[in-house]
Swiss-Prot record:
Gene: TMEM131L
Membrane topology: Single-pass type I membrane protein
GO BP annotation list: negative regulation of canonical Wnt signaling pathway
Protein name: Transmembrane protein 131-like
PANTHER family (UniProt xref): RW1 PROTEIN HOMOLOG, TRANSMEMBRANE PROTEIN 131-LIKE
Annotated stretches, region: Disordered: 943-973, 1097-1134, 1146-1181, 1254-1341
Glycan-bearing residues: N343, N438, N592, N648, N708, N845
Residues modified to Phosphoserine: S1112
UniProt main location, coarse: membrane
Family: Belongs to the TMEM131 family.
UniProt topological domain (Cytoplasmic) ranges: 890-1598
Length: 1598
């Protein structure tokens, strides 16, 4: 605050009287006066006020100097003003009244009071300034001089300690005017805490430190315009805070020294350092505020505040203290002081924590102890007073015997000079309690021990507790304050006694120093000599006590302490322990540890203190670690009366640790259980004892306290080792702790009313009481059911959390059991785990009514994850189904695309054939439109005819989906085969556009190089032809080249009755060949086109198992499912079983060798077929054309005798059925007829062998034909003009070939019969294979065979040959030479070395066929054509186009080309690598390579037809077709079907040549891998005039 302004000159015009009368008017009229200030206010002297200066509050600051540097002019004006105004009567103050306003409690504030000296002549000396209230404080002022007309300032500090308005007076003691008063006021308020409540302010004490020195850092002053000052402060603590704070802050002189580093910005660096320092001190005020313990803190604190009233910037950089003790804690943060403020800034805080360690045992230490008092200086030592040593004065209080409430006070003077005690008094609060006795006046006390006075308690028989001081004034300027606490305590007799405790004093015993007794320091190692040192010191101390006890006068002893003397002798009964100072505040204290669990520890603390004024060394250890514990125990028993019998001298369960929890320091464990402490005078320390029980039970021991003051001391310890023990449900843990759940039947009866989907779950809840029956508190941390926390195996602990149980307390737990009703007795384990890692195990026992388990098990809901599991399962199954659908869709698309590609190729082939010239191959579509139309046009309806009449027209083939049939084995065929129909009469309307023409006389030029056509082509037995000799079919095996009848004839015969007659072409060309009577021509260009299509045949990937036990290895292992790979639509064309042929051969009449005789035998049975051959009279003019073609080189037709089944087939025109056997996949390769340039009368077919395998494919693959050709066409070839040939093919289905039409209709639409090739789907197109031709050098002579000798060839089922269609050489124009041309080459080279090509499929010729020879003209046989066999043949695969017709009727004139050894192949054929068109025997390298010189053994043998296979039995059950004929015998069919009855001149030869039909069916197995279901298709159902009967056992006439 700035100083007061000077009065303006205008003010002197006022009159002095007006100023004296109206001060208020003067303030108003004086415009230049300071607002709110009282200028020139006079304060009259107060003579009744005595100047006082309290030494307690005499802490000094550097006095603020008066403003004496006023200029002369201002002084003259002020003096004149003062003369006029006051006339030397007093001082003027500004402001007139000092009001501090509102201030928080404990927060100091300061304001400046200015005082003016109005006198112009005299100066005013201010001796002191003081206040009447403790809330206002003024720094000490000593003899401050205010010059005349000068001014000075005083800093008034307001520190409110209570709430409300505070008003007081400030007294200024002057030398000339006396004491002047000045009014000050303020308002105190509490500080609001964060919680909204006002905090209670503890007692605050105002302290003013003194600035001792100010040092300048030269480096800082030289470099910058600021100065770094080191300010050292000293503060002497007055007696109010002496005992609370002195132990922390003061050294021996009771002075707190601090050093503060400040940075001051100098405005004028030219000034001297002393001037700047004085300016700083004038504007800087430093105060301390000491506070007692508050409710929130147990620590006493001193806060340091600074007020800066100048304009320079001051930065407080550091504050530190000089105390050497570690108990002083300083909190400081650097701060920039604000300028020109009235509030102080707190910069540091000091906390003393040393009393906290003692506070815990202070109350205990106040009892039963009479220490010596130590003097505390009651007034600060100011300059001019000598420094006093507090240890120079010692006091002791003596209790009077037999007198309660009376004490004597002794004084020990250690000064070198005497001290005069002027007066003794007590505080006014305790004047009515304590009385001073026996003090006569000032006492001169020379060095020594003196009794100075007595104290007496004025009250009796009243329990009191008083804390007060006794003050002694001396001649040295010091006042000794003796703090005392007087409290009531019961005596041994039970009366109320009083004891006095001195807090600042010392004991009269002092231990020996190191110099006097070095042996004690050496005994700290606890060697065997330790007891010797302790016993010697203890005896010496005890003897001295005896001498001192009998002393009468005050004298010095060897101990160096003056002992007061009693007026009379003490009693002998007084124990030594009463006289001996104790290091333990409670001598009889015993640390009693409560029950402690084993392996657990418990800690308790006790306090040790130093009762003397000298440092004391202590060694604490358990008695068991002492070298001689028994000797130490006897000494303690002697001194303190310890009970030896209860002490365990060897236990190690007690250990020592050092700790002071009030300091917040972690406990420090002792090494080996021993502690070494050093206690300063009156210092206390806490020591912890750790009890770790090793066994159950109570144990007692001692803690020894070795010291250099009283030699030895002790404290008793006692502990109890216990165990945790629980009861649950009134049962102890273990095997007997069974907790039973009783489940009554009434509870489980609710199962009847519950639903499984209901949310209510049946459960049983039971409460159990958990009791702590042990002495230890137990904390249960977890409850487990068989190792699972809180729940498991249907049990669940409700409210499962940690809980604690004190001794003899209990708690209830609830356990819920949810049964799954799988067992009537459930036993589980309940485990309670405690914090001490102990486990208490109990058994949970649940019994359920056994008879209610099934009832309740139905209503138990599934687990929580069950619904999610099923949802997940359904999801994945749906995904799998979707994937399957997608895969099937893609596969179907692929099949459709392949089918469309095949149709496109077939359409292209068909268009090519039709555009060029009539050919002998017809595509699928052309077959649909031509072949079928041909049948419909030339075959009259047979409706209404009787059973014994021949059908008029050739019926249409019955269709069935062939994709369901897959050839699996070469085993027993259980299918009912349809037999093809030969056209009996041809109408005049020739359908040239819709039918394929016969092949040209000259085969198409062969392509060079072999092409990988159908892999593995099978041999199939040829049908038994009517009119052939039975001897011929006995053993004669037909070579493949022999089977190669003209492709046109064979295809026409197959296409009429088979679904494969659609001529389904995969890779090769296909031809529907019509009877010989129809005039069709084949161009060579079309043949070349067909050849290109035949070559890219596919190889099957999967080879099905062959179940033929007697077949050749090639047939057994290499039979594949070829149809699935060579045709996109996976269709098969079955081949008719050869059993029909065998059966029919037995019934065929012997034909004459002449062609006429053959045609006359119109009704001769060739096979058990169901259709009669039309008469010769019904033939068309095409017959003549066919005869003309025959003369031109075509193969003659053989007229078969088929009069046996005429009566049964009068309504139906049966088509020859091409059906494969489900036991084996046998394919017969029928080579295409090589039309030679022979004369027209030559009708003999030349049998020959391909000599060069490399030229195999040159046979004109374009002439490759489809196997399922209409067998009616084949019949047309066997009929002569004007003759009616009848040919029958036997069915092996077990039904009679003469089954009535009614039975056929009964089975319509059922699953009944095995489907045949004729029942396949009309859209199915048979595969074509490359044509076969013989090498040019292998032609057979024209006289090899007789034209009149019928030939019966029986091909065994074991003739299996994997044929290759890759290369089939054929001459372009020249006719095929005869057979004997190249036999040697074929034998040497081998027709097809195994392994040269891809794995070829076996070709098994399983049946037999018969051919009637009518013409003697030689003819080249076409490549072997597929003949209906008793096995399933994949017509879409390997045999595509190779066997275009089932029947290969041969007209042979020379039998020399058929050697006996070459015609019998019971063991199958080898696998030739490139040439598969020839019959190869396993035993002979070349089957047909015999020289032509072999004598002819062919004769006209009657075809003896044995009874048909199960002719009188026919299954009408739908399941009979699914599992085969259940009446089929397990015997070999062929053993009875091929009986040979030689009737011709060749009979003997044929018996040798013929081969008995090998056993084909190993046994009946209805569960064969493949079953061909006879499912009626839409074609048969829609067309009521469908020509082919739907009877599964239907057989057409051949």
């Amino acid at each position: 605050m700035a100083g007061p302004r000077r009065p303006q000159p205008g003010c002197y015009r006022r009159t002095a009287a007006a100023v004296n009368l109206l001060l208020g008017v003067f303030h108003v009229l004086l415009p230049c006066g300071r607002p709110g200030g009282a200028q020139g206010q006079a304060i009259e002297p107060m003579p009744n006020v005595v100047e006082l200066w309290q030494a307690e509050e005499g802490e000094l600051l550097l006095p603020t100097q008066g403003d004496s540097e006023d200029d002369t002019e201002e002084q003259s004006q002020e003096q004149s003003f003062s003369d006029k105004l006051f006339s030397g009567k007093g001082l003027h103050f500004q402001p007139s009244v000092l009001d501090f306003g509102v201030q928080f409690l404990g927060q100091p504030a300061a304001k400046i009071l200015y005082a003016y000296n109005p006198s112009r002549e005299s100066e005013v000396v201010v001796n002191s300034v003081f206040t009447a209230a403790r809330h206002f404080h003024v720094p000490p002022v000593h003899c401050r001089v205010i010059p005349a007309m000068g001014k000075t300032s005083f800093r008034i500090i307001f520190l409110p300690t209570e709430e409300g308005s505070i008003e007081s007076s400030l007294f200024i003691n002057t030398s000339s005017h006396g004491v002047l008063s000045y009014h000050v006021s303020g308002f105190g308020t509490r500080v609001m805490s964060a919680k909204g409540s006002a905090e209670q302010l503890p007692n605050a004490y105002f302290l003013l430190p003194q600035v001792q020195t100010v040092q300048l850092s030269q480096t800082q002053a030289e470099t910058t315009n600021s100065s770094l000052l080191q300010v050292q402060l000293e503060c002497s603590l007055h007696n109010k805070v002496c005992q609370r704070l002195k132990s922390c802050y003061v050294e021996s002189d009771d002075v707190l020294r601090l050093q503060m580093s400040i940075i001051v910005t100098m405005e004028n660096t030219s000034k001297e350092f002393e001037e700047n320092t004085q300016d700083l001190l004038d504007h800087l005020s430093i105060i301390y505020v000491a506070t007692d313990k508050s409710e929130s803190s147990d620590d006493s604190a001193v806060n340091m505040y600074i007020l800066h009233s100048g304009n320079s910037l001051i930065w407080i950089q550091d504050v530190r203290h000089f105390s050497q003790r570690d108990v002083l804690s300083l909190q400081f943060e650097p701060v920039l002081l604000p300028t020109s403020t009235t509030n102080f800034t707190k910069i540091a805080s000091f906390t003393c924590k040393a009393p906290s360690c003692e506070s815990g045992a202070r109350e205990d230490g106040k009892k039963k102890d009479t220490p010596t008092l130590k003097a505390c200086l009651s007034s600060p030592v100011v300059q001019g007073y000598f420094r006093m040593d507090p240890s120079a004065t010692q006091f002791h209080i003596e209790n009077h015997e037999n007198t309660s409430g009376l004490w004597s006070l002794w004084y020990l003077n250690h000064f070198d000079h005497g001290v005069v005690l002027n007066d003794v008094f007590v505080s006014k609060e305790t004047k009515h309690v304590l009385k001073i006795l026996n003090f006569t006046g000032p006492l001169f006390l020379p060095p020594g021990c003196w009794k100075i006075f007595s104290l007496k308690l004025a009250v009796k028989d009243i329990a009191i507790n008083v804390f007060t001081h006794v003050f002694l004034t001396t001649n040295i300027g010091a006042v000794f304050a003796i703090p005392l606490q007087i409290y009531s305590a019961p005596t041994k007799e039970g009366s109320l006694g009083f004891e006095v405790i001195a807090h600042c004093g010392m004991h009269y015993f002092m231990g020996k120093s190191k110099a006097e007794n070095p042996d004690w320091e050496g005994s700290l190692s606890l060697d065997p000599s330790t007891w010797d040192v302790d016993s010697e010191l203890a005896n010496t101390l005890y003897e001295r006590w005896k001498k001192l006890k009998h002393g009468d006068v005050c004298k010095r002893t060897v101990l160096g302490v003056t002992r007061f003397a009693h007026s009379k002798k003490s009693k002998e009964s007084e124990p030594f322990a009463v006289f001996l100072p104790r290091l333990v505040p409670e001598p009889g204290l015993v640390l009693n540890f409560s029950a402690t669990a084993l392996r657990n520890s418990m800690v308790k603390y006790f306090v040790v203190k130093n009762p003397s004024s000298w440092p004391v060394s202590l060694q604490l250890l358990p008695v068991s670690l002492y070298p001689k514990p028994e000797a130490a125990a006897r000494l303690l028993h002697k001194w303190f009366g310890t009970d030896m019998q209860m002490i365990n001298l060897t236990t190690s369960e007690f250990q020592l640790t050092k700790a002071c929890p009030y300091l917040g320091v972690r406990s420090e464990g002792s090494r080996f259980g021993i502690l070494h402490l050093h206690l300063q005078p009156l210092e206390r320390k806490r020591v912890g004892v750790v009890f770790t029980p090793a066994d159950y039970g109570k144990v007692s021991s001692l803690i020894l306290i070795r010291n250099n003051l009283t030699v030895i001391d002790m404290i008793g310890v006692e502990g109890f080792g216990a165990r945790e023990l629980l009861k649950v449900g009134g049962r102890l843990p273990g095997t007997g702790g069974s907790l039973r759940f009783k489940v009554p039947e009434s509870t489980l009866m609710d199962c009847r009313r519950q639903l499984k989907d209901s949310k209510q779950i049946l459960s049983i809840t039971k409460n159990f009481k958990v009791e702590n029956i042990g002495p230890l508190p137990i904390t249960v941390t977890s409850l487990k059911i068989n190792g699972y926390n809180c729940q498991g195996y249907g049990f669940e602990v409700l409210d499962c959390h940690q809980f604690s149980l004190g001794p003899n307390t209990s708690r209830d737990i609830s356990i819920v059991f949810t049964p799954d009703f799988t067992s009537s007795w459930v036993i589980r384990e309940l485990t309670l785990v405690t914090a001490a890692d102990l486990e208490f195990r109990f058994t949970l026992n649940v019994t359920l009514p056994h008879h209610l388990l099934p009832l309740c098990a139905d209503v138990v809901p599934g687990p929580s994850w069950e619904e999610s599991f099923w949802r997940l399962t359904v999801f994945f199954v749906s995904l799998s189904l979707l994937g399957v659908i997608l895969i099937a869709f893609q596969q179907a698309q692929y099949i459709l695309m392949e089918f469309m590609k095949t149709r496109q190729r077939q359409n292209a082939s068909s268009s090519s054939q039709q555009s060029t010239a009539p050919v002998d191959v017809i595509s699928a579509h052309s077959h649909k439109s031509n072949c079928k139309n041909f049948l419909d046009a030339y075959a009259p309806s047979d409706k209404g005819r009787g059973k014994s009449c021949l059908p008029v027209s050739s019926p249409q083939s019955r269709t069935q989906n062939a994709t369901k049939r897959s050839p699996a084995t070469c085993g027993h065929s259980q299918k009912k085969h349809k037999c093809s129909v030969y056209y009996g009469r041809h109408r005049g309307a020739a359908v040239a556009s819709s039918a394929g023409a016969p092949s040209e006389d000259r085969p198409a030029p062969a392509k060079a190089g072999g092409c990988p056509a159908g892999a593995g082509e099978a041999w199939v037995g040829l049908r038994c032809a009517g009119g052939l000799s039975a001897n011929l079919q006995k053993s004669l095996a037909l070579p493949r080249s022999f089977l190669g009848k003209d492709e046109n004839t064979l295809k026409s015969a197959v296409a009429a009755s088979s679904p494969s007659s659609e001529c389904h072409v995969k890779e090769g060309a296909q031809t529907c060949v019509f009877p010989k009577e129809t005039d069709f021509q084949v161009s060579e260009s079309v043949a070349e086109l067909k050849e290109r299509e035949v070559c890219p045949m596919k190889t099957p990937k999967k080879l099905p198992e062959n179940h033929l036990p007697r077949s050749s290895p090639q047939c057994q292992s290499d039979l594949p499912d070829i149809s699935r790979k060579n045709n996109g639509n996976n269709q098969q064309v079955p081949v008719k079983n050869e059993v029909d042929n065998c059966e029919s051969l037995k019934k065929v009449d012997t034909k004459s060798s002449s062609e006429k005789k053959i045609h006359k035998a119109a009704k001769e049975d060739g096979c058990s077929e169901k259709q009669d051959i039309p008469s010769i009279e019904q033939e068309d003019p095409y017959r003549k054309k066919a005869l003309q073609e025959k003369k031109e080189g075509n193969v003659q037709n053989l007229n078969w005798n088929k009069n046996r089944m005429c009566r049964k087939n009068k309504k139906r025109g049966a088509a020859q059925v091409l059906r494969p056997s489900d036991q084996s996949e046998l394919k017969l390769v029928c080579s295409e007829f090589e039309r030679s340039e022979l004369s027209s009368d030559i009708n003999v077919r030349n049998w020959r062998i391909q000599e060069n395998p490399g030229e195999a494919c040159k046979a004109g693959a374009s002439s490759g034909s489809s196997l399922p050709a209409t067998q009616g066409e084949a019949e047309g070839y066997f009929q002569k003009p004007g003759k009616k040939g009848a040919e029958k093919s036997c069915s092996d289905s077990g039904s009679d070939c003469g089954s009535s039409s009614g039975s056929v209709r009964a089975s319509r639409g059922s699953w009944g019969s095995w489907s045949s090739a004729s029942s396949s789907d009309g859209d199915r197109k048979p595969a074509v294979g490359p044509p076969r031709c013989l090498l040019p050098g292998d032609s057979v002579s024209q006289n090899d065979f007789s034209s009149e000798a019928p030939i019966s060839l029986n091909l065994s089922r074991n003739i299996c040959n994997p044929t290759d269609v890759s290369g089939l050489p054929a001459p372009a124009d020249a006719p095929c030479p005869s057979l004997p041309a190249g036999p040697a080459a074929a034998e040497e080279q081998g027709l097809c070395a195994p392994g040269d090509l891809w794995p070829a499929q076996p070709v098994c010729v399983t049946g037999g066929f018969g051919c009637a020879l009518e013409s003697g003209g030689p003819a080249a046989l076409p490549p072997p054509a597929a003949v209906p066999s008793s096995s399933f043949i994949d017509w879409n695969a390997t045999c595509e186009g190779q066997f275009p017709s089932v029947y290969c009727p041969l007209e042979l004139n020379d039998y020399n080309a058929f050697p006996e050894e070459g015609m019998n192949y019971p063991s199958g054929f080898p696998c030739p690598a490139e040439v598969q068109t020839d019959f190869i025997d396993h035993s002979s390298p070349s089957a047909w390579g015999s020289p032509p010189s072999v004598p002819t053994a062919w004769g006209h043998a009657s075809l003896i037809s044995s009874p048909p296979y199960l002719t009188s039995t026919r299954s009408l059950s739908p399941m009979s077709g699914l599992f085969g004929s259940i009446w089929a015998p397990q015997s070999d069919v062929y053993e009875n079907c091929c009986a040979i009855n030689p009737t011709t001149e060749h009979s003997a030869h044929m018996e040798n040549q013929a081969v008995m039909c090998k056993e084909y069916y190993p046994g009946f197995n209805p569960f064969r891998a493949y079953m061909d279901l006879d499912i009626w298709t839409s074609t048969a159902n829609r067309n009521a005039n469908f020509p082919l009967s739907r009877d599964s056992s239907y057989c057409g006439n051949v």
